[in-house]
Amino acid sequence: MSILFSGDFHANSRDELKLITKKTLINKYQKAEYDEIKYHIILGDAGFLWPGNEKTDLFNYKALANRPFPVLCVMGNHEPILGMSDVPEVNIGIGEKVLQINDNPFVAYLKRGGIYKIENHRFLVLGGALSIDKEFRRPNISWWKREYWDEAEKVNLFLLLQKHKKFDYVLSHTGPNRINRIVNTYKTPGITLKFFDEVAVLNEEIDERITCKQWFCGHWHTDKYYYDENQRRGYQYLYEKTALLKNDEIIVL
């Protein structure tokens, strides 16, 4: 069985749904490979539960329900769930619990700082990022302070990493700071790009403490891959492309 990865979804606000429909995925990977997909992981900014967006969520859920596999989401920065404290936690047999937001299709968020065992792969799950446009957003309506990790989360993470340093893959929203600078030249008209992102700096510190085969992330609205000779691993950024992980083979289309 395999795992599908995709980048920012934004509740389909930029027509991202067309990138992950059943038809698109079969055209990309062929029916035999599509039938092997066990989970779909969105690498942050899934954008579900946006205030006033209930009809859009229902539309997206209906489209995603045409596919037979559950959706698991990394925490991004444009995520209403960051401001919620009453989301049910459920155990689906992949290690840490997940935060379930929908039944059919099954949609849930992975916990930041969690270790998950999915299809025999060991994942460290991170999340969050700087909202470069937060000056134009409203606190707790379109921007949430918890896009940054709080001190307790960081302390718990580093305690975890004292015991666990070896992973198969890392999943985050933004990448490590130095890799972001190498790979991305993302610019938005009218918005000053702020390169100092506490989450990206945190990711870089984590990157220096662990070993893994590859790092997957989104956030930058680009599809790029960078291999770091010093760390001896790759960093895959996704947006319009998707990645399929089967055993340890990765197909990006």
Predicted features along the sequence, with ranges:
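Active-site regions of enzymes building and remodeling cell-envelope glycoconjugates
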Residues: 69-71, 89-94, 105-110, 123, ...
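Cap/insert and terminal regions of metallo-dependent hydrolase folds
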Residues: 48, 60-61, 68, 168-217
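Core catalytic region of metal-dependent phosphoesterases/phosphodiesterases
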Residues: 6, 12-118, 192-203
